[in-house]
From Swiss-Prot:
Assembly description: The mature envelope protein (Env) consists of a trimer of SU-TM heterodimers attached by a labile interchain disulfide bond.
Ranges spanned by the short sequence motif YXXL motif, renumbered to the chain: 650-653
Protein name: Envelope glycoprotein
Keyword NADP among UniProt keywords: no
Motif CX6CC: positions: 550-558
Organism lineage: Viruses, Riboviria, Pararnavirae, Artverviricota, Revtraviricetes
Length: 668
């Protein structure tokens, strides 16, 4: 069981496995996910897969956002090994493997290390090496040197077997026996799983993009050959409840032209306060998911303009968002969606009131059949809900017997199969196959970060990343008038209630204007069809010589009543404002920036040649000086060498002291 001291030679870290090379290549060819909204809640599933057999070792699902759903995953080592570890029969005690209980038990006491395959490091090898061709490639594991990393995405450690019969390092281990084979063994587990592992995500793993599966290699640390196991970690993101259409109009989800319906005059009926202090309301009954608002004042004869009506919608949404989530409104853009659907429904939970007598909101007359084409979320459902819409239900009630009326809380509505209404009759609901979902109604206003809007003004052809936009309903869904006042303190609740009611009034005014627009469009289409039919009949008869087409037909002349002139005027004003903004924006740009906007290829060309051009310019500027310095330095070195050579050929004379000599004298 003892292995050599770390490090070991890398020659023991290779083996032939052509199938794993192919799997490793396929992992790098996976398509990425679309960038999602960071605030959207999804059903996220993390999967650990054996790359050799393709069997899932673990699949953990939970609800959350893409930025915080990183659970701790538990799986067994034998689930990512399978039958790939088959020690030689000539090795009676290999100490590893998953085919026998004794080998599974001995494998528990063997250290292991894990190497990432997503790093694409050449020195670490490929799948045939377990991405651990040399020492230093390991980033996590259970060894005596405790490998760590500051850049890898996961950590893998040993766990503890479940149940009261746990394994220890010194003797018998019941969980290592498969209860399907050894049913009489005490403590036997399913599949003999006694090598639990714990996988956790690091901070880098939480920040990376899991747009495809990422692979790792696990190797046992033992004397001789270190066996290899390959596994991958992947994330699957699914919406909890995809938006579904609610209402009798089956063509609106596809946004096709509406079918011609009978012209019904819009009638707004103000309701007097109830005995319990209720506020007047305006309701729409038997409408195809007709958007309406509950606590509003009676309609004024004078209708506000389109611009003011749209501004009130955005302003009411901003005030509500500012009160409930002020951090989101410090620097943001709220954009009103100009294409259908203009409203969306969010299914919520709430406490409705049960009344024996019909309230005033149930006595209104049907109006135009407006339909909300998107209902998402999970909320309270009444009656028998078909399987196609059960995803919208978090709680389902069968309703009540008898003649009862269920009134939705303030700020919410019953989205039924036959239309949107503030109250429902149980007698009608029990008699028909209708069903209802408690919903909130929100205008489709998207929330954008400031960088997204600025990029449009700068006319950038591309973005660094896909823009993230979400509707305000996703940020404020479930915040009703009653819910805000119930879940917060009294003063704050009253303030938020006032903001929410202001938004509701703006929505109601906008919906009434939409109804009037639909009526005007119906009249315009009817008038146009009459003109077309009359011209066709006149052209067939060709009685123009008798005084004209109308005289020949002996009927009143029909003329096209154009009720869309205001639309054309508004569009002309809009184009004029856009042109003025574009001129103002162009005047604030310099010439170089204008070149970049007019020629998209100019940016690519400049960025490609700028580097070599700068290098060439630096060489021309500083090249002569550097060359002179280099030549002077070489000359100095050569001069020193010549001086040394000449010095070695001569010997320096010493300083000898010269004494005076006395010449001999002769005596005469």
């Amino acid at each position: 069981m003892e292995g050599p001291t770390h490090p070991k030679p890398s020659k023991d870290k290779t083996f032939s496995w052509d199938l794993i090379i192919l799997v490793g290549v396929l992992l790098r060819l996976d398509a990425g996910m679309a960038n999602p909204s960071p605030h959207q809640v999804y059903n996220i599933t993390w999967t650990i897969t054996n790359l050799v057999t393709g069997i899932k070792a673990n699949a953990t699902s939970m609800l959350g956002t893409l930025t915080d759903t990183f659970p701790t995953i538990y799986f067994d080592l034998c689930d990512i090994i399978g039958n790939t570890w088959n020690p030689s029969d000539q090795e009676p005690f290999p100490g590893y493997g998953c085919d026998q209980p004794m080998r599974r038990w001995q494998q528990r006491n063997t250290a292991f290390y894990v190497c990432p395959g997503h790093a694409n490091r050449k020195q670490c090898g490929g799948p045939q090496d377990g991405f651990c061709a040399v020492w230093g490639c390991e980033t996590t594991g259970e060894t005596y040197w405790k490998p760590t990393s500051s850049w890898d995405y996961i950590t893998v450690k040993k766990g503890v077997t479940q149940g009261i019969y746990q394994c220890n390092g010194g003797g018998w281990c019941g969980p290592c026996y498969d209860k399907a084979v050894h049913s009489s063994t005490t403590g036997a587990s399913e599949g003999g799983r006694c090598n639990p592992l714990i996988l956790q995500f690091t901070q880098k793993g939480r920040q990376t993009s899991w747009d495809g599966p990422k692979s790792w290699g696990l190797r046992l640390y033992r004397s001789g050959y270190d066996p290899i196991a390959l596994f991958s970690v992947s994330r699957q993101v699914m919406t909890i409840t995809p938006p579904q259409a609610m209402g009798p109009n089956p063509v609106l989800p596809d946004q096709k032209p509406p079918s011609r319906q009978s012209q019904i005059e819009s009638r707004v009926i103000p309701h007097h306060p109830q005995g319990n202090g209720g506020t007047p309301g305006i309701t729409l009954v038997n409408a195809s998911i007709a958007p309406l608002s509950t606590p509003v004042t009676p309609a004024s004869p004078k209708r506000i303009g389109t611009g003011n009506r749209l501004i009130n919608l955005v302003q009411g949404t901003y005030l509500t968002l500012n009160v409930t989530n002020p951090n989101k409104t410090k620097d943001c853009w709220l954009c009103l969606v100009s294409r259908p659907p203009y409203y969306e429904g969010i299914a919520v939970l709430g406490n409705y009131s049960n009344q024996t007598n019909p309230p005033p909101s149930c006595l209104s007359v049907p109006q135009h059949k407006l339909t909300i084409s998107e209902v998402s979320g999970q909320g309270l459902c009444i009656a028998t809900v078909p399987k196609t819409h059960q995803a919208l239900c978090n709680k389902t009630q069968k309703g009540h017997r008898g003649t009862h009326y269920l009134v939705a809380p303030n700020g919410t509505y019953w989205a039924c199969n036959t239309g949107l209404t503030p109250c429902i009759s149980m007698a009608v609901l029990n008699w028909t196959s209708d069903f209802c979902v408690l919903t909130e109604l929100w205008p489709r206003i998207t929330y954008h970060e400031p960088e997204y809007i600025y990029s449009h003004f700068e006319n950038k052809p591309r973005f660094k990343r896909d823009p993230i936009s979400l509707t305000v309903a996703l940020m404020l869904g479930g915040i009703t008038v009653g819910g805000m006042a119930r879940n917060r303190n009294r003063d704050c609740g009253l303030l938020e209630t006032a903001q929410f009611r202001q938004l509701q009034m703006a929505m109601h005014t906008d919906i009434q204007a939409l109804e009037e627009s639909i009526s005007a469009l119906e009249k315009s289409l009817t008038s146009l069809s009459e003109v077309v039919l009359q011209n066709r009949r006149g052209l067939d008869i060709l009685f123009l010589q008798e005084g004209g087409l109308c005289t020949a037909l002996k009927e009143e002349c029909c003329f096209y009543a154009d009720h869309t002139g205001l639309v054309r005027d508004n569009m002309a004003k809009l184009r004029e404002r856009l042109k003025q903004r574009q001129q103002l924006f162009d005047s604030q740009q310099d010439g170089l920036e204008g070149w970049f906007n007019k020629s998209p290829w100019f940016t690519t060309l400049i960025s490609s040649i700028m580097g070599p051009l700068m290098i060439l310019l630096l060489i021309l500027l500083f090249g002569p000086c550097i060359l002179n310095r280099l030549v002077q330095f070489v000359k100095d070195r050569i001069s020193v060498v010549q001086t040394l050579v000449l010095t070695q050929q001569y010997q320096r004379l010493g300083q000898w002291r010269l004494r005076p000599t006395v010449s001999p004298q002769l005596n005469v």
